[in-house]
From Swiss-Prot:
This protein's domain notes: The beta-hairpin motif is involved in DNA binding.
Record text on subunit structure and interactions: Forms a heterotetramer with UvrA during the search for lesions. Interacts with UvrC in an incision complex.
Gene Ontology MF terms in the entry: ATP binding; ATP hydrolysis activity; DNA binding; excinuclease ABC activity; helicase activity
Annotated binding of ATP, by residue: 39-46
Species, as recorded: Erwinia tasmaniensis (strain DSM 17950 / CFBP 7177 / CIP 109463 / NCPPB 4357 / Et1/99)
GO cellular component: cytoplasm; excinuclease repair complex
One Pfam family this sequence matches: UvrB_inter
Upper taxonomic lineage: Bacteria, Pseudomonadati, Pseudomonadota, Gammaproteobacteria, Enterobacterales
Alphabetical keyword list: ATP-binding, Cytoplasm, DNA damage, DNA excision, DNA repair, Excision nuclease, Helicase, Hydrolase, Nucleotide-binding, SOS response
The UVR domain, residue ranges: 634-669
Coiled-coil regions listed: none
Subcellular location: Cytoplasm
Entry protein name: UvrABC system protein B
Domain Helicase C-terminal span(s) in chain numbering: 431-597
Length: 674
């Protein structure tokens, strides 16, 4: 079989990586359904996974617990596989308020949502890649377990065009309208088409930098070409092309008509139940809302909140699992669950919260009972659909350990030779004064400190106390949004302040090589924030520094502390032994400080077409952009789009293309920020 994945890296597997790669690949080839990779902080887990993907040549989905880590993984995978389809699939809502009813105050809250067009385009691109290619890595958030259009209906709706095909212009335009494309002869943008004589230009919904030109002659497709929608320059002539629907939720007309009949039948049954229970108001409300939706579906082919009828539109039975991104993944696909100790419980919790809200809507006549089937997957359904799975975590949960039969693949030795931090336990009585003296020692040699406490009040008091004693301190709390949080972490690394105080925000996925001390106050207070996994994750924040040290303040050693200290010492001994055997001298990490915010640079460089000019890199030339909030970046995107269109109208195509290259980069920054 020809090799489709091409791994691009200047590094070769080192430390525990070669053994981990070998064992993972053997397990997958032997048909093991579940494997757990215990990879410590800084051991190159993503690189190990990338090697497994490249060697086994299988389409892969990587699940991350949140958008920040998904963006980070997407950036890393994009660098490892520049010539393959690395896709990004997260929730496309910038803002989402689901419809809800509060019976106590008789308040109905309408659904309100703001969709991010760029992320919608990336989601469409992800499903297209899974349907068309084998060399695909989709990095997804837990959004992947939510209902998506049925892949069978989606495939049925595609429009295939090929050179020499006999089809008249009206038939093409009718099919485009069914795919929910709109005609716009003035503003040519994603999801639209324009007609000029016998030429139809189509801007595919999943594309952001190319369009399709269909030239007809005497009811026959004479030529198909890919062109730059900005400059109009033809880039290639192609023999065939497939146009995908504008949305995942597109449905054939006959299916809509059939669904409408089924909805009417359910409405009659439900009205009878409500009237029998003397719920006249609910019966009237349900009848009015459903009739309005049916009218809209009949006239337009869709209605607001059409997802509530998804059971009928996809032809499923009551209680059946909704189609999701997993239905698009080939049968021999591979699933990698990153930070599995966080992601797995998240998957389990999604269904229950959604169900409680919908039951109230059904009970009070806002929705038909079939709306309960518009839901995320249940955990059991996820287990049934998941292909061969690799769980990746520094602290695997009980579920992962049980599923992989207690067999854990250790990736403890880092390629850099860095050791896990030294762990000390000190008494609580003098913890604040002791911490102050430790901070001063670190500040004197230009190193940083993380401090984790139990409550918001303690964090505020400690921040105030340390500030009064002349230390440069910031406090990270739950009210701070993702972008500001990333900026605070970057400022800490840059040395704008020396100490960061937090509660539960100093855990997974934060790379800060400058941090040499992690202080855990009140470590002996057994609970979620001081569990074995939380302690190991927090101690791991100092594992990227040559002088890494963790101080646990506690008057007694709890079972969680004992296990966390024992595990850290086990890892440290293994790392030391490996270094001695191979004559390795530990090297400090020298990671670029702007890494997480430069998500889009590699992508923009890959996507930008070779031109006879130097497209200015916004990220490199204008650091102000890195500080922008999602709102600021969105505004900048609109400004650049307007600027680009203006250049195109003035026939200044080189300048327009230059602005377009900048636009790519700002969009990718926006993904990291959103």
């Amino acid at each position: 079989m020809s090799k489709v994945f091409k791994l691009n890296s200047e590094f070769k597997p080192a430390g525990d990586q070669p053994e981990a790669i070998r064992r993972l690949e053997e397990g997958l080839e032997d048909g093991l359904a579940h494997q757990t990779l215990l990879g410590v902080t800084g051991s190159g887990k993503t690189f190990t996974v990338a090697n497994v993907i490249a060697d086994l040549n299988r389409p892969t989905m990587v699940l991350a617990p949140n958008k920040t880590l998904a963006a980070q993984l997407y950036g890393e995978m994009k660098e490892f596989f520049p010539d393959n389809a690395v896709e990004y699939f997260v929730s496309y809502y910038d803002y989402y308020q689901p419809e809800a009813y509060v019976p106590s105050s008789d308040t109905f809250i309408e659904k309100d949502a703001s969709v991010n067009e760029h992320i919608e385009q990336m989601r469409l691109s992800a499903t297209k890649a899974l349907l068309e290619r084998r060399d695909v890595v989709v990095v997804a958030s837990v959004s992947a377990i939510y209902g998506l259009g049925d892949p069978d209906l989606y495939l049925k709706m595609m429009l295939h065009l090929s050179r020499g095909m006999v089809i008249d212009q009206r038939a093409i335009l009718r099919r485009l309208a069914e795919l929910q494309y709109t005609r716009n002869d003035q503003a040519f943008q994603r999801g639209t088409f324009r007609v000029r004589g016998e030429v139809i230009d189509i801007f595919p919904a999943e594309s952001d930098d190319y369009a399709l030109r269909v030239e007809l002659f005497d009811e026959e497709v004479e030529r198909l070409s890919i062109f730059d929608p900005l400059t109009g320059q033809i880039e290639s002539v192609i023999p065939r092309y497939t146009i995908y629907p504008k949305t995942h939720y597109v449905t054939p007309r006959e299916r809509i008509l059939q669904a409408m009949e089924e909805i009417k039948d359910e409405l009659v049954e439900r009205k009878k139940v409500l009237l029998d229970n003397n719920k006249l108001l609910e019966e009237q409300r349900l009848s009015q809302r459903t009739q309005f939706d049916l009218e809209m579906m009949n006239e337009l082919g869709y209605c607001s909140g059409i997802e509530n009828y998804s059971r009928y539109l996809s032809g499923r039975g009551p209680g059946e699992a909704p189609p999701t991104l997993f239905d698009y993944l080939p049968a021999d696909g591979l699933l990698v669950i990153d930070e599995s100790h966080v992601t797995i419980p998240q998957i389990g919790g999604m269904y229950r919260g959604d169900r409680a809200r919908k039951e109230t809507l059904v009970e009070y006549g806002f929705r038909l009972p079939s709306a309960l089937d518009n839901r995320p997957m249940k955990f059991e359904e996820f287990e049934g659909l998941a292909p061969q799975t690799i769980y990746v975590s520094a602290t695997p949960g009980n579920y992962e350990l049980e599923k992989s039969g207690g067999e854990v693949i250790d990736q403890v030795v880092r390629p850099t030779g860095l050791l896990d931090p030294i762990v000390e336990v000190r008494p609580v009585g003098t913890q604040v004064d002791d911490l102050l003296s430790e901070i001063r020692q670190r500040v004197a040699i230009n190193e940083r400190v993380l401090v984790t406490v139990l409550t918001k009040r303690m964090a505020e008091d400690l921040t105030e106390y340390l500030t009064e004693h002349g230390e440069r301190v910031r406090y990270l709390h739950s009210d701070i949004d993702t972008v500001e949080r990333v900026e605070i972490i970057r400022d800490l690394r840059l040395g704008k302040f020396d100490v960061l105080v937090g509660i539960n925000l100093l855990r997974e996925g934060l790379d800060m090589p400058e941090v040499s001390l992690v202080a855990i106050l009140d470590a002996d207070k057994e609970g979620f924030l001081r569990s074995e996994r939380s302690l190991i994750q927090t101690i791991g924040r100092a594992a990227r520094n040559l002088n890494g040290k963790a101080i646990l303040y506690g008057d007694k050693i709890t079972p969680s502390m004992a296990r966390a200290i024992g595990e850290t010492e086990r890892r440290r001994e293994k790392q030391q032994l490996h270094n001695e055997e191979h004559g390795i001298v530990p090297q400090g990490l020298n990671k670029k400080i702007s890494d997480i915010l430069e998500l889009g640079q590699g992508l923009a460089k890959n996507k930008a077409k070779p031109r006879n000019m130097k497209g200015r890199s916004i990220v490199e030339d204008d650091p102000a952009h890195v500080d922008l909030t999602p709102q600021g970046l969105q505004k900048r995107i609109h400004q650049l789009e307007a600027q680009m269109q203006q250049h195109a109208q003035n026939l200044e195509f080189e300048e327009a293309a230059q602005v377009r290259d900048q636009l790519h980069q700002v969009r990718e920054l926006f993904i990291a920020a959103s």
